[in-house]
Amino acid sequence: MSRIDGRTPEQLRPVTIERGWSKHAEGSVLISFGDTKVFCTASVTEGVPRWRKGSGEGWVTAEYSMLPRSTNTRGDREAVRGKIGGRTHEISRLIGRSLRAVIDCKALGENTIVLDCDVLQADGGTRTAAITGAYVALADAVAWAQGKKIVKAGRKPLTDTVAAISVGIVDGTPLLDLCYEEDVRAETDMNVVCTGDGRFVEVQGTAEGAPFDRKELGALLDLATAGCVDLAALQRDALVRTQDA
């Protein structure tokens, strides 16, 4: 099958991870999955939510949003509408769950890290790009907190990497990392979150046009796990590069 951008079915879009985009945030990343661009910041706060106090454990949470003109037509800011949409809540929770899957909250101590993921430009896969970029921002924030002695030395707060990718069936063919034009045509659409050692954190799959069978599900999961392996390697490469390189 010939894809819109010339990729093979199992090929990621060009992925770039640029650290240190904000001089204020303890961790910050601009991540690009092709034309999808998401700005992720990680902010460290000493203390935890009231319901977490006295537990000795930290907390990691996330917020997701899209800039008004991140898509083909402008959308009002949700703050102007006076209500956060269901999709925004869902994706924010997904990002938070994904990151907490690889955090040892006990090692974090009673500290909170908030990830803000803002979509600058959308061309499919914004939530998967957000998760992948947010992990790198989180890693930088954890390193900053350890350097400042806010997080105690000893146990490692990060237990693994985590990344996410979209897969889908378009015109009967399983594809990795769908752009927007592929996403809207997909008979099946799925988002998969994996840890660096290949375990699944979340699998969100929907038959948009036609039901999918067990064989197709297996093919999609195989594509997704291979894609997440590649993304984990890119995350590791980004984290070993100096920010001014």
Curated annotation (Swiss-Prot):
MF terms in GO: 3'-5'-RNA exonuclease activity; tRNA binding; tRNA nucleotidyltransferase activity
Keywords from the named record: Nucleotidyltransferase, RNA-binding, rRNA processing, Transferase, tRNA processing, tRNA-binding
Cited SUPFAM superfamilies: Ribonuclease PH domain 2-like, Ribosomal protein S5 domain 2-like
Binding annotation for phosphate: 87, 125-127
Superkingdom of this protein's organism: Bacteria
Enzyme class: transferase
E.C. no: 2.7.7.56
Gene3D superfamilies: GHMP Kinase, N-terminal domain
The keyword Glycoprotein belongs to this UniProt entry's keyword annotation: no
Catalytic activity: tRNA(n+1) + phosphate = tRNA(n) + a ribonucleoside 5'-diphosphate
UniProt-listed InterPro entries: ExoRNase_PH_dom1, ExoRNase_PH_dom2, ExoRNase_PH_dom2_sf, PNPase/RNase_PH_dom_sf, Ribosomal_Su5_D2-typ_SF, RNase_PH, RNase_PH_bac-type, RNase_PH_CS
Biological process terms in GO annotation: rRNA catabolic process; rRNA processing; tRNA processing
Subunit relationships: Homohexameric ring arranged as a trimer of dimers.
PANTHER family in the record: EXOSOME COMPLEX COMPONENT (PTHR11953), EXOSOME COMPLEX COMPONENT RRP41 (PTHR11953:SF0)
Family: Belongs to the RNase PH family.
Annotated function: Phosphorolytic 3'-5' exoribonuclease that plays an important role in tRNA 3'-end maturation. Removes nucleotide residues following the 3'-CCA terminus of tRNAs; can also add nucleotides to the ends of RNA molecules by using nucleoside diphosphates as substrates, but this may not be physiologically important. Probably plays a role in initiation of 16S rRNA degradation (leading to ribosome degradation) during starvation.
Protein name: Ribonuclease PH
Species this protein is from: Streptomyces griseus subsp. griseus (strain JCM 4626 / CBS 651.72 / NBRC 13350 / KCC S-0626 / ISP 5235)
